[in-house]
């Protein structure tokens, strides 16, 4: 079915807007995956703030021009499902990786982060990135660690004095 010029422009503008604000992109081939399974994937993507789009490669190439994902042009061959991570850079990679384990016909083609095109074999590295909450928790624990050590050091001085006084007291009791 032919798409009109105005519709094509709208699709390009929509995908460009999404790509401009996305943190990472995962491209997959979903040929042979049932509609029911794709609906489940779309639902999971919505829950994780990942935007999925299936667009013609020529439109996708135009849409990513001027964004960090301009490097994916060579990976846009054949049917492509684009997964844009909007909040967590590893979200789309985790979703696609888990889905590919369940579906033999689902194949990750490439990924892109920070303006670099990565092969599909690098999906584990991207999927293992911590979520925003995990990263903030790690940062907080790193920031709190020196304060915790300082508090322990301050608490250790009085307890050493107390142990020394108790030892002297016990020594005097034994001597008497």
Swiss-Prot record:
Domain of life: Bacteria
GO MF annotation list: large ribosomal subunit rRNA binding; structural constituent of ribosome
Gene Ontology CC terms: large ribosomal subunit
Any single biological process term in GO: translation
Alphabetic keyword roster: Ribonucleoprotein, Ribosomal protein, RNA-binding, rRNA-binding
InterPro entries to which the protein is assigned, alphabetical: Ribosomal_uL10 (IPR001790), Ribosomal_uL10-like_sf (IPR043141), Ribosomal_uL10_bac (IPR022973), Ribosomal_uL10_bac_type (IPR047865), Ribosomal_uL10_CS_bac (IPR002363)
Summary of the function given for this chain in its UniProt record: Forms part of the ribosomal stalk, playing a central role in the interaction of the ribosome with GTP-bound translation factors.
Complex and partners: Part of the ribosomal stalk of the 50S ribosomal subunit. The N-terminus interacts with L11 and the large rRNA to form the base of the stalk. The C-terminus forms an elongated spine to which L12 dimers bind in a sequential fashion forming a multimeric L10(L12)X complex.
Family under the similarity heading: Belongs to the universal ribosomal protein uL10 family.
Alphabetized HAMAP family for the sequence: Ribosomal_uL10
The protein's name: Large ribosomal subunit protein uL10
């Amino acid at each position: 079915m032919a798409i009109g010029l105005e519709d094509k422009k709208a699709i390009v503008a929509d995908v460009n807007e999404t790509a401009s604000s996305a943190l990472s992109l995962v491209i997959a081939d979903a040929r042979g995956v049932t509609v029911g399974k794709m609906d489940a994937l779309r639902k999971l993507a919505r829950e994780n703030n990942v935007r999925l789009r299936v667009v013609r490669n020529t439109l996708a190439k135009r849409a990513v021009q001027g964004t960090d994902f301009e490097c994916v042009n060579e990976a846009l061959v054949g049917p492509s499902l684009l997964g844009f991570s909007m909040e967590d850079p590893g979200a789309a990679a985790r979703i696609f990786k888990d889905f590919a384990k369940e579906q033999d016909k689902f194949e990750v083609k490439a990924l892109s982060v920070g303006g670099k095109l990565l092969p599909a074999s690098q999906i584990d590295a991207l999927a293992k990135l911590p979520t925003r909450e995990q990263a903030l928790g790690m940062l907080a624990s790193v920031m709190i660690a020196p304060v915790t050590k300082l508090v322990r050091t301050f608490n250790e001085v009085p307890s050493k004095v107390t142990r020394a006084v108790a030892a002297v007291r016990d020594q005097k009791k034994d001597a008497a």
